[in-house]
């Protein structure tokens, strides 16, 4: 048996200390460059055809539409001279096809048109956050590649989502300019509203919730897979970093990955995001039980555990006397509780360092942040980043970012904007 839990994890590479920052950054930067050149790598590097050069108009309303979960949401957004948003006439309705019944494209557009009806007289532009796998086109439309999140609406696959909505609205007597974008790109653009009063050199957007992704603004000269771009301009890139394969998997990562429906895919996302950390933690705890770190009753209970939600894992690591969830029901003594904490917290600590590497790679690729007066704005959204209890994940990420960027002479400002995707969609609709 390994002498200590720390030695057990370190010899297997599951710790923040085991993350090779320089190697991880080099792999990220290599794949980002290759992806922008159109070469096949694990990062999709999807051009969003949205820049950041235009100022955000003050006092001009824009309609925002958000489709990405069980609900569709709509609102009217206006910005003041300080970049503060005013959100009005907010409404929501159920997402067609997400309630266990099949829906059609016509159902989808009818529901959208009905949701937007009270807002259509107030603005000419619509910023549409569409958080499903889609190919963004140069006219800021989106071709749906596939549905996720259990949505059942097969006849919309391969269709142009924005054009379909524009047609449905025009049939009702309303001609609108629609800008479609992903939630990650919208999160990045939300920083533009903060940039009205704070002068940033560039922008990054990170989602770290049930899943993860990052977007950043790349110089057009580096985006060689898109022809005839203005050479001196820049464009937002949706990197799709959840699919990054440049971080070596530990034996725990491989064992957990083998149990998922998409084995071998989204391996980076499975190391850092909320949908997967509980499942990964179960394999770590069970390995610790087999290694002899738990009492006999606790070992038996852990080895019989068939699933572990991240909330239960996180809650118990934060408070090992909690009685809720799968771990709270197990016959732990105080030594067992200490073992859960010692085995569990490194899972979250590694996630924080990997997330910081992701951020820093994007900051470096923007070419900005060389002057502390004008740092790169990194807008971060997602429950895993802000609500993890086992460790202060937000503070750990911030410290790692300082440690990584500081010696490189780079500066970043990590910010939170409430309802970032909604605010970013408003910016997109106003500045396209």
Name what the model sees in each region.
Residues 60-66, 125-129, 177-179, 203-207, ...:
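Short glycine-aspartate micro-motif
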Residues 214-215, 225-267, 271-273:
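Alpha-helical segment proximal to the catalytic Tyr-Lys
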Residues 72-77, 188-190, 205-206, 212-218:
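Short beta-strand scaffold segments in enzyme catalytic cores
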Residues 97, 184-186, 209-212, 220, ...:
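Acidic, glycine-rich active-site loops and adjacent beta-strand->loop/helix elements
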Residues 1-90, 94, 100-125, 170, ...:
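ATP-binding/phosphotransfer module of carbohydrate and carboxylate kinases, centering on a glycine-rich
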Residues 57-59, 121-122, 174-175, 183, ...:
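Short, well-ordered loop/turn elements at secondary-structure boundaries
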Residues 69-70, 79-81, 133, 211-213, ...:
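Conserved beta-strand elements of beta-rich interaction domains across eukaryotes
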Residues 92-110, 134-204, 220-248, 392-399:
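Glycine-rich phosphate-binding loop and adjoining helix at the ATP-binding site
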């Amino acid at each position: 048996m390994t002498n200590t839990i720390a030695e057990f994890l370190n010899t297997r590479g599951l710790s923040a200390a085991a993350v090779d920052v320089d190697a991880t950054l080099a792999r990220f930067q290599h794949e980002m460059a290759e992806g922008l050149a159109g070469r096949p790598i694990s990062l999709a590097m999807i051009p969003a055809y949205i820049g950041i050069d235009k100022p955000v108009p003050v006092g001009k309303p824009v309609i925002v539409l958000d489709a990405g979960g069980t609900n569709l949401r709509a609102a009217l957004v206006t910005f003041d001279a300080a970049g503060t948003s005013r959100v009005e006439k907010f409404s929501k309705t159920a997402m067609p096809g997400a309630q266990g019944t099949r829906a059609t494209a016509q159902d989808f557009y009818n529901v959208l048109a009905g949701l937007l009806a009270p807002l259509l007289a107030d603005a000419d532009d619509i910023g549409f956050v569409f958080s499903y796998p889609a190919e963004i086109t140069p006219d800021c439309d989106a071709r749906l590649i596939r549905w996720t999140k259990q949505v059942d609406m097969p006849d919309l696959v391969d269709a142009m989502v924005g054009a379909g909505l524009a047609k449905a609205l025009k049939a009702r007597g309303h001609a609108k300019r629609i800008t479609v974008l992903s939630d990650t790109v919208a999160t990045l653009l939300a920083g533009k509203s903060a940039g009205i009063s704070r002068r940033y050199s560039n922008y990054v957007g990170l989602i770290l919730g049930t899943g993860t992704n990052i977007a950043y603004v790349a110089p057009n000269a580096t985006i060689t897979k898109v022809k005839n771009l203005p050479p001196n301009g820049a464009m937002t890139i949706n990197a799709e970093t959840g699919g990054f394969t440049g971080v070596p998997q530990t034996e725990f990562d491989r064992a957990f990955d083998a149990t998922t429906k998409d084995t071998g895919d989204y391996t980076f996302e499975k190391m850092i995001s909320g949908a997967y950390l509980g499942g990964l933690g179960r394999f770590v705890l069970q390995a610790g039980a087999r290694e002899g770190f738990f009492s006999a009753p606790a070992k038996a209970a852990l080895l019989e555990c068939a699933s572990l939600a991240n909330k239960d894992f996180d809650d118990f690591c934060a408070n090992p006397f909690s009685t809720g969830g799968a771990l709270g029901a197990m016959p732990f003594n105080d030594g067992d509780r200490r073992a859960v904490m010692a085995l569990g917290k490194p899972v979250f600590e590694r996630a924080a360092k990997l997330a910081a590497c992701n951020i820093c790679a994007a900051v470096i690729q923007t070419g900005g942040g060389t002057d502390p007066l004008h740092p790169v704005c990194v807008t971060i959204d997602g429950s895993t980043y802000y609500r993890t209890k086992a460790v202060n994940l937000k503070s750990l990420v911030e410290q790692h970012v300082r440690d990584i960027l500081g010696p490189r002479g780079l500066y970043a400002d990590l910010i939170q904007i409430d309802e970032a995707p909604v605010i970013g969609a408003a910016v997109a609709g106003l500045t396209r």
